[in-house]
Amino acid sequence: NTEINSRLGIVLGVTVEQVEKAIQEHPRAVAVLVNNPTYYGICSDIRSIVKLAHEHKMMVLVDEAHGTHLYFQPDLPVSAMDAGADMAAISMHKSGGSLTQSSILLTNKGVNADYVRQIINLTQTTSGSYLLLSSLDISRRNLALRGRESFEKVMEMAEYARKEINEIGGYYAYGRELINGTSVFDYDVTKLSVHTLGLGLAGIEVYDLLRDEYDIQIEFGDVSNILAYISIGDRIQDIERLVGALADISRIYKKDKTGMLSGEFVNPLVVKSP
C-alpha cells in the first residue's frame, strides 16, 4: 500500500522498500507495475525500482499515461525507458497532442517487440483506426522537432500559474517542495494541482464553478483538489484567465472551512486480485 498525504488528500508514490517487501511476499511474481508519474505529478524512484526488480529477474512495466512529456525535457523527472524499464504505455493524447484514445507502447532492449506485437494482435482489433494512427505520427513528428521547447514553455506557464495562485490566498498549488526522497522522489511540475480546502470549498465545487460560471474546463476535481492540465496548445492568456477565475471564486464563494472533510483514505478489502 502506498502512503497517503492526508493534508492534501493524494496518494503518494511507491517506495523502493515497499516494492522490495512486495517481491519478498510474492516470490512467484514475474513483473513489477508502477506509475510514472501519478495523476497529481508524484514520481517514485523508478531507477532504483528497476534495478531492484532486475536483480530479482523480474520485468518492470510502467503505466506512463501521464508521462509522455518526460521524454522531451531534461529538467523533468526521468522517463521509464531512460530508467531502464522493460515496457511503458504512454498516452500521447494526454500531453503529446494526438487524438483521444491514441497511445504508444514502448519496449526496451531485451524485450521481443515482434512477440509483443503478436500478442497485441491476438487481444485487440487488427483493424486499427488510421485517424488515430496518423494523429500519433503527426504528434510524434511535432514532439521530435519541437518537444523540448514546447514543454519548456509548459513548465514556465505551470510555474507562473503556481506562483500566482498561491498569492491569492486559500489555495495551495503544490510543487517540488513535496519531494522527500522516498514516497515523493520527484515531481512533475507541468501538473498544476491545487488544494482548495483552505477556501472552505471541495475541489469538485471549484471544478464545477470554473466550468459553469467561467466556461473553463479543467481536468478534474476531487474532494480536496483540482487539476488543470496545461498542454502544448495553451497560451499565457489561458493561464491568466484561469488565475483570474480562481481569484474571483476565492472572493465570491469562500466559506468557513470548519467541518470540511479531511483527505483520509480507507483501503478497500481486496477479495481477489486481478
Give the location of each predicted region.
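Conserved PLP-enzyme active-site core in the AAT-like
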Residues: 1-178
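Non-catalytic terminal extensions of PLP-dependent enzymes
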Residues: 163-166, 177-183, 188-274
